């Protein structure tokens, strides 16, 4: 089947590039130990509720639900899995979960091994997570599974004439909680009616983040009452645009928090800058005052940094298929 072949090829590709790239290398290290980690940390006879998020953004979207369930059902244990290192590396010590680990690649053998170990009493997949083999196996084992804060668009493969396989993937969900009425209508057209519109959980999380935001004295010194533009989770095409603007407007300061914190990418950002800059991990009270651009080269600060910007930008990656293939 094409899907399983694509997963195998992706797995091979990650292994091939891991020696040369930091992010795939971290992912593979996490995958190598995931089953042993589960054997060591799973509590015998405990009941686990499993949450899966692709990355940090999806985790933040599902976090209000995780914490409400944690508070309401304290006898249950929480398992949190990530696909991306940018989620796992930041939240591997998240206190709202009992176990945090990577999700093994969606190959049938991995799926059976993972579910045999965890045996969750229910599962929540956040937003765009539609892993076929996991969902098929959960349905086969009669484990309730829910899609949370999902959003659907007309161009996704589920709504194409050739998308029957992927429509069946959606039918594995016991219920789908979507962000808007349009998503509900699209699903109804393909016969999926176990759907509820609940809005965007990011708004709940934004209010929570506002209460939890940390003071960052170095960022305050950098800003120094100057018009500051914050670019969060940026990618190279975004950076080309706002760095060009920044270079031509000396009255504006810039804070860049790139999605990929890789040394090669950071060097590429620096190469484009024509004004003084400093990296956050190398900043002090003296050099941060002289900089016009602050590069955030570490994880975990972005939610606290946005409030320092007069204008903020966050890149939202478009998922044309709505699935990881």
At which residue positions do the language-model features occur?
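Donor nucleotide-activated moiety binding/catalytic core segment of transferases
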Residues: 202, 281-312
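Active-site and donor-binding regions of nucleotide-sugar-utilizing enzymes
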Residues: 15, 19-212, 235-236, 259-261, ...
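Conserved small/polar residues in nucleotide/adenosyl-binding loops
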Residues: 314-321
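Glycine-rich phosphate-binding loop signature in dinucleotide/nucleotide-binding domains
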Residues: 117-119, 223-224, 308
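Membrane-interacting alpha-helical segments
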Residues: 2, 6, 10-17
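Conserved catalytic-core segment of nucleotide-activated headgroup transferases in glycan assembly
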Residues: 58-69, 215-283
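Short, surface-exposed amphipathic charged segments that create phosphate/polyanion-binding patches used
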Residues: 115-118, 210-215, 269-271, 289-297
């Amino acid at each position: 089947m094409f899907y399983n072949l694509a997963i195998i090829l992706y797995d091979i590709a990650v292994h091939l590039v891991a020696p040369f790239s930091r992010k795939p290398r971290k992912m593979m290290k996490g995958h190598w130990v995931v089953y042993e980690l589960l054997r060591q940390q799973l509590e015998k006879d405990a009941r686990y509720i499993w949450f899966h998020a692709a990355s940090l953004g999806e985790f933040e979207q599902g976090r209000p639900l995780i914490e409400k369930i944690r508070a309401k059902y304290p006898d249950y244990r929480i398992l949190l899995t990530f696909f991306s290192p940018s989620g796992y590396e930041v939240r591997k010590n998240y206190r709202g979960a009992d176990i945090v680990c990577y999700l093994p690649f969606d190959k049938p053998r991995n799926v059976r091994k993972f579910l045999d170990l965890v045996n969750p009493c229910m599962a929540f997949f956040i937003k765009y997570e539609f892993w076929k083999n996991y969902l098929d196996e959960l349905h086969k084992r009669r484990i309730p599974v829910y899609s949370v804060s999902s959003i659907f668009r007309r161009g996704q493969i589920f709504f194409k004439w050739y998308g029957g396989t992927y429509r069946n993937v959606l039918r594995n969900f016991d219920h789908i909680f979507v962000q808007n009425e349009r998503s509900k209508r699209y699903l109804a057209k393909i016969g999926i009616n176990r759907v509820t519109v609940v809005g965007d959980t990011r708004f709940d999380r934004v209010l929570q983040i506002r209460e939890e935001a940390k003071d960052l004295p170095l960022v305050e010194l950098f800003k120094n009452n100057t018009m500051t533009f914050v670019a969060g989770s940026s990618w190279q095409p975004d950076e080309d645009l706002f760095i060009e603007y920044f270079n031509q407007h000396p009255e504006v300061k810039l804070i860049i928090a790139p999605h990929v914190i890789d040394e090669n990418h950071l060097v590429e950002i620096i190469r484009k800058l024509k004004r003084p800059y400093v990296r956050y991990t190398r900043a002090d009270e003296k050099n941060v005052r002289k900089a016009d651009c602050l590069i955030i080269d570490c994880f975990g600060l972005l939610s606290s940094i946005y409030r320092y910007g007069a204008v903020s930008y966050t890149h939202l990656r478009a998922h044309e298929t709505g699935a990881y293939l």
